[in-house]
UniProtKB/Swiss-Prot annotation:
It is an enzyme of class 4 (lyase). The active site is at 138, 546. It comes from Salmonella typhi. SUPFAM superfamilies: Phosphoenolpyruvate/pyruvate domain. This is Phosphoenolpyruvate carboxylase. The lineage of its organism: Bacteria, Pseudomonadati, Pseudomonadota, Gammaproteobacteria, Enterobacterales. Belongs to the PEPCase type 1 family. GO terms for biological process: carbon fixation; oxaloacetate metabolic process; tricarboxylic acid cycle. The gene is ppc. The keyword NADP does not apply. InterPro entries: PEP_COase (IPR021135), PEP_COase_bac/pln-type (IPR022805), PEP_COase_Lys_AS (IPR018129), PEPCASE_His_AS (IPR033129), Pyrv/PenolPyrv_kinase-like_dom (IPR015813). The keyword Lyase applies. PROSITE patterns: PEPCASE_1, PEPCASE_2. Coiled coil: none annotated. Its cofactor is Mg(2+).
Length: 883
């Protein structure tokens, strides 16, 4: 076994040993023995020992109610520790991804070696780099914030232990700290008692900024600058920061009645307060460091006589005073006090930037570049990346809410019912009103609560400091009037600038119509004048996959993007595609580099804007070093996609994709929508109903409280199938379609697509990853334990289908086993399976006990309920992505 895996395995083994000691201290030898027996049986079962597999099932079925929770917690905590070790491994000197910042150097060298690219072209591509990461509070981050903090500390311990020069005494101290942290985690309840509020979610986002991004972003820019200097002789300008962060936490009200206008207003203030808090810490350091006397005449003129003896300090102290006054005012506002704005209130980034940049220029001019390029440069870059708002907010609302609000207004005004008008009539009315100088809203009108909420939200946007709200996203957008309606409501609220409004196309039909909708919009003169040559469109990955299956959805997403790129290029519009990806494959998740290089040519010209969801935020940005690594990967992928775009697919490949799309969609919908047994099977074979009890996000799991699979959100839909290891939404239909095309004699064509078309090879790679995490015997066990015998044939049919799908994908990829080209991921899945399997078996047992109690009309046993929640969290940790 090579060194990188042995280092990971030895850390995992060491952490497991410490956890074992903790369990023994807390609960006694007998519980540890029980856990160890189960672990050994699971390992042997994985190696193919059928007798031990049966013994594993019997042992877990026979656990007493008192043993359930300790056993569930032991395996769940072990998986959290394994994930922590793996995250550390990805940035450790012994890990294969330790050189991830090197990924930029590798990309630059690759670009320089292209005969048709020169340094000037590469430099231009660097200067136009734009990456906006949108943090969303999807309810897939199952781990509590308090435990995330402890995992970060454990990571630090692993780092110290890796130091070859560590003295025995220091090693002893670090091991002691490690034991304390693992004991603290064991004695902490891993399941939240209450759902987080939208404000709690926003605070979780601010914690990511403070604990990781605040340091990670300047570190990434130093790394980028170093590689550019070395490879191109090019220095990044001080004010060049290609990365920005936006958040949906506190702004996303789609289907979440808990996010109100008042909540958004509060989160905007809280975000500004947090920014002042973090910048105050920076300025405090600069006051201490910038004790220099030499300064340029310009700086001396700025500080006057009073500050001449220590000009830099003087300026920093003045800035500190402004930050403190701003923070006090924001604190009062957060408490609900209405105070007049103080003189010098910081509302714009320039107010922070100017004194800092004046110091920077003076230090450079006076031969103190080494000092200027230290902490001061990091702070300047933070001003550009985070600034006064810290993170900007997107507002997201469903299109029908705007339609209903306008319907209520037109009915009150006696001019008809907007909701029942044709699309042409809606557009004519909206354009007329957008061009009108008089207000539309009557003065003393009392709207319904729902309409008032929509109007109040628009008012919050109009009143927010410019630059603190990034975009207004319209979910379930279907028509040009959906976009114009939002512009009209914003105009009525008194907005004084052109707010980017992004339609989100998310079902199969909407993706197919996206280009037509945008073409109609761009043909409206008023609209063209408003957008000033820039347009953002959001592509939905989760709902389209839930609607049509993963193969049809991914092709519809590709075609929609391709058509939009060409339409905007023809119209001279700079298009920013906003990707609403999830962490799991069924919601569009894929390794960043592969995913970006598989997009249509030209899709990243306007930069990359992408959601980072739930638990993926922790995996990709949980530590400063991991942040550097993730941002470096994105940077290299954007540069490569823009300078070495993938080829346009051949027409014959497009025809094959059309074919695959139709067959896979028919297969997927044939089961999910048309098979009468499917919904009862889904409800019994997965913990879908029990998931509702988990206090995950602030958003309800269903768009409508009643209703079947259609009303279920994409996240719980995927989460449920991930739990029982069938992973159904991420593959159903895809393999059947591939098999049919192979039978039609087109296997060699598929192999060529896999070899020469990044879009197709990435799709197959994603399927392989899903297949690696799926498990036939576990899915079968859930059926045996939980599903009515009349539904067993459907379960068997689906498992047989999965087995066939694996064979066809391996044949097309010319591989003998899954993940052959990504052994690191295969190793990681293998490592965790030994600990995830017992949790799956135990979960099926707990679901059986819980449902039996309910059928008998007895009140639930809290030990069973609590253990069930722990297994759900544990399996999520084992799968490394939930929804």
């Amino acid at each position: 076994m090579n060194e990188q895996y042995s280092a990971l395995r030895s850390n995992v083994s060491m952490l497991g040993k410490v956890l074992g000691e903790t369990i023994k201290d807390a609960l006694g030898e007998h519980i540890l023995d029980r856990v160890e027996t189960i672990r050994k049986l699971s390992k042997s079962s994985r190696a193919g020992n059928e007798a031990n597999r049966q013994e594993l099932l019997t042992t877990l079925q026979n656990l007493s109610n008192d043993e359930l929770l300790p056993v569930a917690r032991a395996f769940s905590q072990f998986l959290n520790l394994a994930n922590t070790a793996e995250q550390y491994h990805s940035i450790s000197p012994k890990g294969e991804a330790a050189s991830n910042p090197e990924v930029i150097a590798h990309t630059l060298r690759k670009l320089k070696n292209q005969p048709d690219l020169n340094d000037a072209t590469i430099k231009k591509a660097v200067e136009s780099l734009s990456l906006e990461l949108v943090l969303t509070a999807h309810p897939t981050e199952i781990t509590r914030r308090t435990l995330i903090h402890k995992m970060g500390e454990i990571n630090n311990c692993l780092k110290q232990l890796d130091n070859t020069d560590i003295a025995d005494y220091e090693r002893h101290q670090v091991m002691r700290r490690l034991r304390q942290l693992i004991a603290q985690s064991w004695h902490t309840d891993e399941i939240r008692k209450q759902r987080p509020s939208p404000v709690d979610e926003a605070k979780w986002g601010f914690a990511v900024v403070e604990n990781s991004l605040w340091q990670g972003v300047p570190n990434y820019l130093r790394e980028l600058n170093e590689q550019l200097e070395e490879n191109l002789g090019y220095k990044l300008p001080v004010d060049f920061v290609p990365v920005r962060f936006t958040s949906w936490m506190g702004g996303d009200r789609d289907g979440n009645p808990n996010v109100t206008a008042e909540i958004t207003r509060h989160v905007l203030l809280l975000s500004r307060w947090k920014a002042t808090d973090l910048f105050l810490k920076d300025i405090h350091v600069l006051v201490s460091e910038l004790s220099m006397v030499d300064a340029t005449p310009e700086l001396l003129a700025l500080v006057g006589e009073e500050g001449a003896s220590e000009p830099y300090r003087y300026l920093m102290k003045k800035l500190r005073a402004r930050l403190m006054a701003t923070q006090s005012w924001l604190e009062a506002r957060l408490k609900g006090e209405k105070l007049p704005k103080p003189a010098g209130l910081l509302t714009q980034n320039e107010q922070l930037w100017e004194p800092l940049y004046a110091c920077y220029q003076s230090l450079q001019a006076c031969g103190m570049g080494i000092i200027a390029n230290g902490e001061l440069l990091d702070t300047l870059r933070r001003v550009k990346c985070f600034g006064v708002p810290l993170v900007r907010i997107d507002i997201r609302q469903e299109s029908t809410r705007h339609t209903e609000a306008l319907g209520e207004i037109t009915r009150y005004l006696g001019i008809g019912d907007y909701e029942s008008w044709s699309e042409a009539d809606k557009q004519a009315f909206l354009i007329r009103e957008l061009n009108s100088k008089r207000p539309l809203l009557p003065r003393n009108w009392e709207p319904s609560n729902d309409t008032r909420e929509v109007l109040e939200t628009c008012k919050v946007i109009a009143e927010a400091p410019k630059g603190s709200i990034a975009a207004y996203v319209i979910s379930m957008a279907k028509t040009p009037s959906d976009v114009l309606a939002v512009h009209l409501l914003l105009k009525e609220a008194g907005i004084g600038f052109a707010m980017p409004v992004a339609p989100l196309f998310e079902t199969l039909d909407d993706l197919n119509n996206a280009d037509d909708v945008m073409t109609q919009l761009l043909n409206i003169d008023w609209y063209r004048g408003l957008i000033q040559g820039k347009q953002m469109v959001m592509i939905g990955y989760s709902d389209s996959a839930k609607d049509a299956g993963v193969m049809a959805a991914s092709w519809a997403q590709y075609q929609a993007q391709d058509a939009l790129i060409k339409t905007c290029e023809k119209a001279g519009i700079e298009l920013t595609l906003f990707h609403g990806r999830g962490g799991s494959i069924g919601r569009g998740g894929a390794p960043a580099h592969a995913a970006l290089l598989s997009q249509p040519p030209g899709s990243l010209k306007g930069g990359l804007r992408v959601t980072e969801q739930g638990e993926m935020i922790r995996f990709k940005y949980g530590l400063p070093e991991v942040t550097v690594s993730s941002l470096s990967l994105y940077t290299s992928a954007i540069l490569e996609a823009n300078l070495l775009p993938p080829p346009e697919p051949k027409d014959s490949w497009r025809h094959i994709m059309d074919e695959l799309s139709v067959i896979s969609c028919e297969t997927y919908r044939g089961y999910v929508r048309e098979n009468k047994d499917f919904v009862p099977y889904f409800r019994s074979a997965t913990p879908e109903q029990e998931l509702g009890k988990l206090p995950l996000g602030s958003r309800p799991a269903k768009r409508r409280p009643t209703g079947g699979v259609e009303s279920l959100r994409a996240i719980p839909w995927i989460f449920a199938w991930t739990q029982n290891r069938l992973m159904l939404p991420a593959w159903l239909g895809a393999g059947t379609a591939l098999q049919k095309v192979v039978e039609d004699g087109k296997q060699s064509e598929l192999e060529a697509m896999c070899r020469d078309w990044p879009f197709f090879s990435t799709r197959l790679g994603m399927l392989e990853m899903v297949f690696s995490k799926a498990d036939l015997w576990l899915a079968d066990y859930y059926d045996q334990r939980l599903v009515a015998k009349t539904l067993w044939p459907l379960g068997k049919e689906l498992r047989d289908l999965l087995e066939e799908d694996i064979k066809v994908v391996l044949a097309i990829a010319n591989d003998s086993h899954l993940m052959a080209d990504l052994p690191w991921i295969a190793e990681s899945i293998q490592l965790r399976n030994v600990y995830t399997d017992p949790l799956n078996v135990l979960q099926a047992e707990l679901l059986y006990r819980s449902r039996l109690t309910e059928e008998q009309g007895k009140s639930p046993d809290p030990r069973v309920e609590q253990a069930l929640m722990v297994t759900i969290a544990g399996v999520a940790a084992g799968m490394r992505n939930t929804g």
